[in-house]
Regions:
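ATP-dependent carboxylate-amine ligase catalytic core
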Residues: 2-82, 98-106, 134
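Residues that form generic nucleotide/phosphate-binding pockets
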Residues: 24-27, 31, 143, 224, ...
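Acidic, Mg2+-coordinating active-site environments of NTP-dependent enzymes
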Residues: 35-41, 48, 60-69, 84-185, ...
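Glycine-rich helix-loop-beta junction characteristic of Rossmann-like nucleotide cofactor-binding loops
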Residues: 56, 113, 265-267
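Nucleotide phosphate-binding/pyrophosphate-handling subdomain across enzymes
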Residues: 64-69, 76-88, 92-93, 106, ...
């Protein structure tokens, strides 16, 4: 189990040192026992894992931590952090309804709970609401106003000229004066149809950080996008003889749709065979 956990935890894409992990686990264990003694409740596995990660970040003196919530945001274990320098929201979709709610608006309310200070906020819009006041993003924006957080709104309207090659997906980010964006061409090693929106959001976030004094150049950004790969995000395994296996972790209706969009973008007109495994509580996914 310890070996598996060491593999699971990484710093700068490298497996963390076993001695560092052992020290972090020892600190987290003592803290967990103290919590149990004071409250009568032992922290959950995710809470303990989050504590271990935070201790590792502290011991390694990390400059920046990209911290993704485990479930929702407001009540998530990761939300104990109060020193955010940037908030980032991807398009909101229905997921974990039993905990987060049945509507996009309900989920947005819980997710917006990560906004606890005036650090800037980058939001990637869904773009499928006729009335912006009804959109889940409007709930996040209201939270930003409450906390004095400057909002940077990006959407697919800023994306143009998407092209797929054998090895990359390329697209243009259009110039936008209000966001201080210039015309920019990016090449991605990941070829999912949703990756341009992901990259646009990350690009905007990096530009905001660079304006805040973090040394991030356009050259660094472009190189990072060209080299970045994430397993099981429309991961293509080539077997030869025109046969490819696609590995993807889509686990909600929106993710399933984006997976099919990615297939159509990369394999239009090709025969396809689907092998799908779904948990019982995610039986609302339809391919």
């Amino acid at each position: 189990k310890k070996k598996n956990m060491v593999i699971k935890m990484a710093e700068n894409m490298k497996k963390i040192d076993k001695a560092l992990y052992s020290k972090a686990v020892s600190i987290a264990r003592n803290a967990s026992l103290t919590v149990e003694e004071k409250t009568g409740r032992h922290p959950t596995r995710f809470e303990v894992e989050t504590t271990v990660a935070f201790v590792c970040f502290y011991l390694e003196k990390c400059d920046i931590v990209v911290l993704e919530t485990g479930l929702g945001g407001r009540d998530d274990a990761t939300n104990v952090i109060t020193t955010e320098i940037l908030h980032i929201f991807m398009p909101i979709s229905i997921d974990h309804s039993e905990s987060l709610g049945d509507s996009l608006q309900d989920i947005a309310r819980i997710k917006s709970g990560i906004i606890k200070n005036s650090a800037p906020t980058v939001i990637c819009y869904r773009g499928d609401f006729n009335n912006e006041e009804d959109s889940p993003e409007s709930i996040i924006i209201n939270k930003c106003k409450e906390k004095g957080s400057k909002v940077y709104k990006v959407s697919r309207e800023l994306i143009d000229n998407i092209k797929v090659t054998d090895s990359h997906l390329e697209f243009d980010i259009l110039k936008n004066k209000s966001l201080s964006l210039d015309n920019t061409h990016l090449r991605l090693s990941m070829k999912g149809a949703y990756q341009p929106a992901n990259a646009l959001t990350a690009y905007m976030a990096l530009k905001v950080l660079s304006e805040s004094g973090f040394p991030v150049s356009d050259e660094n950004i472009k190189t990072a996008f060209e080299k970045t790969k994430v397993a099981f995000r429309f991961e293509i395994v080539e077997l030869g003889d025109s046969v490819d296996i696609i590995l993807d972790g889509a686990h909600n209706p929106d993710g399933a749709k984006k997976f099919v969009d990615s297939l159509n973008l990369n394999y239009e007109g090709r025969d396809k065979i689907y092998i799908t495994g779904i948990f019982k509580d995610n039986n609302n996914i339809i391919f």
